[in-house]
Amino acid sequence: MTIWNVAALTGLLSVGLGAYGSHGLQKRVQDPHLLKSWSTACTYLMFHSLATMAVSLHPVYGKSRWTGPLLITGSCLFSGTIYGLCLLPKGHSLRRILGPLTPIGGLVMLTGWATMLV
């Protein structure tokens, strides 16, 4: 699977999860903060999917072969942990694991962007 395919898959997921957030999530989650977090996760996943697609088409993509994988990994980790935190009930043991992973995903995304500077 190419980086383009992975980016297309994450873009597809962001649209589907965004639709679920708009039409079904309110039946399960009532906290407006969590609903906003879900929306933020969808936005970050979509923007980083598009950025990864653009990077994969860039003629000097090979110069920084880590950019695409870092953007995708970071956005999946960042957004994925937010989705989990929104869906898991308060007090669930996985919440203690997912919470600290969210900013790590953000740092991985930042690293991906930084690789484009060199």
Curated annotation (Swiss-Prot):
One Gene Ontology term, aspect cellular component = endoplasmic reticulum membrane
* Membrane disposition: Multi-pass membrane protein
Q: What is this protein called?
A: UPF0382 membrane protein C1782.12c
Give the family, as the similarity comment puts it: Belongs to the UPF0382 family.
In terms of superkingdom, the source organism counts as Eukaryota
- Mind giving the lineage of the organism this protein is from? Eukaryota, Fungi, Dikarya, Ascomycota, Taphrinomycotina
Task: Give its localization.
Answer: Endoplasmic reticulum membrane
Q: Which InterPro entries does the protein's record reference?
A: DUF423 (IPR006696)
Intervals, Cytoplasmic compartment: 62-67, 118
